[in-house]
Design a protein with these regions (language model features):
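Hydrophobic faces of well-ordered beta-strands that scaffold small-molecule active sites
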Residues: 231-233
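Bacterial Sec-dependent N-terminal signal peptides
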Residues: 1-24
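Short, acidic/polar
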Residues: 241-245
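Catalytic and substrate-binding clefts that recognize carbohydrates or anionic sugar/phosphate headgroups
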Residues: 77-227, 236-238
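A low-complexity, Ser/Thr/Gly/Pro-enriched, surface-exposed linker/loop concept
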Residues: 40-79
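Short solvent-exposed loop/turn micro-motifs enriched in small/polar/acidic residues
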Residues: 30-31, 68, 75-77, 154-156
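Short, well-ordered beta-strand segments enriched in hydrophobic/aromatic residues
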Residues: 37, 45-49, 83-91
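Short N-terminal segments immediately surrounding and downstream of signal-peptide cleavage
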Residues: 23-36
Length: 245
């Protein structure tokens, strides 16, 4: 009886694992001697330019995943332009035109999606901002001290740009980011080849910021958070305590 229960449990576990598993693929939509385009999701593309023809498959500090779920897309590569279309956007690149520029690459929304048109060099206007290195000396948004290197006394806190924007799209340039060396015993960081290559990520999400974060984790990896109860009770204040306190 016990053996049957154990066998049934193992079979059930295997079924659950197979149901939860998802086929992952490289999703390379197009590649030639110098450019490679990967469809990470219907709203996220990876765009690579390699002048020496050597594309990067190593993990980077930004992108730790190189395999992705299946995505529906259409590829047109006849003629002078390469065109990749998903349910959210359309990318066009002029064949054999070299490094990505505003003259040979454009990404725009498809009909019915949140409207945008992006070319290399276009800047966001509605970034929702991120975080800052330190709040030392800050009273609300104003710096009150003179010894903090990041801000001067009286200056307002200037948050760094974050991932999301009201523009409905985000652009990430990982061309200079460090790579992992794929050592099976002890992975370590290594520099990218200084060959003038480009390694970009473009995300189109409209105002669906939750979906944008989900798409980001497809290539950047999930960010596990420890449970709140593990931290116990924390309380502190910035200014010094007096001996009476």
């Amino acid at each position: 009886m016990m053996k049957k229960l154990i066998l049934a449990f193992c079979m059930l576990q295997g079924i659950l694992l197979s149901l939860g598993a998802q086929d992952m693929h490289q999703n390379i939509a197009y590649a030639d001697n110098n450019v490679r385009f990967t469809v990470i999701s219907d709203g996220t593309l990876r765009l690579e330019y390699a002048p020496d023809g050597k594309f990067v498959d190593n993990k980077s500090f930004v992108a730790v995943n190189r395999l992705y779920p299946d995505v529906d897309y259409k590829l047109k590569s006849k003629g002078a332009w390469i065109e990749i279309t998903t349910s959210k956007m359309r990318m066009r690149y002029k064949k054999d035109s070299g490094q990505f520029t505003g003259n040979n690459l454009v990404i725009e929304a498809v009909k019915g999606a949140f409207p945008f048109t992006w070319k290399p060099g276009v800047q966001q206007k509605g970034n929702l901002k991120g975080t800052y290195r330190t709040l030392d000396g800050m009273d609300g948004e104003t710096q009150t001290q003179t010894w903090v290197a990041d801000t001067k006394k009286g200056e307002q806190l200037k948050l760094e740009d974050g991932l999301l924007a009201t523009d409905g799209w985000s652009f990430i340039d990982d061309s200079q980011g460090l790579l992992f060396d794929n050592d099976p015993d002890w992975e370590w960081a290594k520099e990218r080849p200084a060959n003038g290559g480009q390694d970009w990520y473009f995300m189109a999400y409209g105002h669906d910021y939750k979906q944008a974060l989900k798409d980001y984790t497809l290539f950047a990896g999930k960010m596990p958070l420890p449970p709140r109860y593990a931290f116990g009770y924390w309380w502190s204040r910035y200014w010094l305590y007096s001996d009476k306190e």
